Swiss-Prot record:
Organism: Shewanella oneidensis (strain ATCC 700550 / JCM 31522 / CIP 106686 / LMG 19005 / NCIMB 14063 / MR-1)
GO molecular function: ATP binding; double-stranded RNA binding; L-threonylcarbamoyladenylate synthase; nucleotidyltransferase activity; tRNA binding
Phylogenetic classification of the source organism: Bacteria, Pseudomonadati, Pseudomonadota, Gammaproteobacteria, Alteromonadales
InterPro entries cross-referenced by the UniProt entry: DHBP_synth_RibB-like_a/b_dom (IPR017945), Sua5-like_dom (IPR006070), TC-AMP_synthase (IPR023535), TC-AMP_synthase_SUA5 (IPR050156)
Protein's name according to its UniProt entry: Threonylcarbamoyl-AMP synthase
Subcellular location: Cytoplasm
Keyword Cytoplasm: yes
Length: 188
């Protein structure tokens, strides 16, 4: 497994690799959201059913416009998300028709977040697009909090480990349905 700085990870991700990287609270697993083979590999590594869907994390909202159908949201609904970003808030938003079922699962929506974590932002900026994001753990297990934990669980199963520090957050992000404003998961 390669151990790389965020600026060196672009080729791994764009060539279908699955990576582990530090986020606001825990290590995440990620891949290219436009590569179904990479998404399927990530789901298999994590032992996560595709039906649950995944999160996209971005450095800015404009990176999410290829996936989110903002025409189905009012200015007020968008403003709620913009008022919380960048930060530990994930919003469930309507999807565009072409979005992979592996990303949205059985839903007509997708979970998206604009991160405040400098390492995550650097990854997304280097890629020029969002990154699939899910906690780095096997389904039902605790997420990894260190590079050593990543190596213990995922050695030989993922393509690279991004070096960096976790953020200060100790809880997962709050998840809000952008259409209804309903809190689906209380986080931080």
């Amino acid at each position: 497994m390669l151990q790389l700085h965020p600026s060196d990870i672009k080729d791994v991700v764009l060539n279908g690799g699955v990576i582990a990287y530090p986020t606001e609270a825990v290590y995440g697993l990620g891949c290219d959201p436009d590569n179904d083979t990479a998404i399927q590999k990530l789901l298999a590594v994590k032992q996560r059913p595709w039906q649950k869907g995944l999160i996209l994390v971005a450095s800015e909202f404009s990176q999410l416009l290829a996936y989110v159908d903002e025409s189905q949201l009012t200015d007020e609904q968008l403003e709620l998300a913009f008022s919380k970003w960048p930060g530990p808030f994930t919003f469930v938003m309507p999807i565009k028709p072409h979005v992979s079922r592996y990303l949205c699962g059985e839903f007509d929506s997708i979970a998206v977040r604009v991160s405040a974590h400098e390492g995550v932002r650097a990854l997304c900026q280097a890629l020029g697009k969002p990154l699939v994001s899910t906690s780095a753990n096997l389904a039902g297990e605790d997420p990894a909090l260190s590079g050593d934990e990543i190596l213990n669980v995922f050695e030989g199963k993922i393509d690279a480990l991004v070096l960096g520090q976790l953020g200060e957050q100790r809880q997962p992000s709050t998840i809000i349905d952008a259409r209804s404003g309903k809190i689906l998961r209380n986080g931080q």
